[in-house]
Amino acid sequence: SSHYDIGNDFYKMWLDETMSYSCGYFKHPEDTLYQAQVQKVERILEKLYLKEGMTLCDIGCGWGYLLIEAAKKYGIKGVGITLSKEQKKKFEERIKENHLEDQLEVRLMDYRDLPESGFKFDRVVSVGMLEHVGRDNYELFMKSVKSIMNPGGLFLLHYISALQEHPGDAWVKKYIFPGGVVPSLREIINIAGD
């Protein structure tokens, strides 16, 4: 969480208004970062086939934009989990600003604690968080997701992938993305296939 607890002001300097810290969906070359992030979230929410009253968990929810949009547009109830105290604080402010206290909550929680949480959800989403999990924990991550899914539930996983497995750059792993791994599609399909 230290990477995300640098302070929200630092991230505000270079992220767009959504405070989304993951890949955007640029439909057109002239799209702004803000448009790309909004378009990405809209596309993810469409793929989740949300209906009013459904429950949604966002693993690695960041500053909460995805859940806020899901609550406003689809009338879902949601829980976001993050390891960052700074993200949690800002997300709680955004929940209040949008008057969504009856629909959304954010927990300071590790995905590994989900099986014991008692939570159950119709939909689960994780955007740009799998890269932090590490190869040795992919299977545990998938089991944790499965443990909170209602029967017939849907899980959408968005991550950066590589064509093949590789250890990554030592300098980047030390100074930019400690513990981070870019998984291959094959790795994730093999684990998620169940």
What would you call each of these model-derived segments?
Residues 52-60:
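Conserved class I S-adenosyl-L-methionine
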Residues 152-160:
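Conserved beta-strand signature within the Rossmann-like core of class I S-adenosyl-L-methionine
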Residues 161-194:
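Substrate-binding/catalytic lobe of Class I Rossmann-like enzymes that use SAM or dcSAM, i.e.
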Residues 98-112:
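Conserved SAM-binding strand-loop segment of SAM-dependent methyltransferases
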Residues 112-124:
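A short acidic, Gly/Pro-enriched loop at the edge of an enzyme's catalytic core
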Residues 139-152:
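A short glycine-rich, Lys/Arg-flanked "PGG" loop and its adjoining helix->strand segment in the class I
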Residues 1-13:
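N-terminal auxiliary segments of SAM/dcSAM-dependent transferases
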Residues 63-74:
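Conserved SAM-binding loop of SAM-dependent methyltransferases across substrates and taxa
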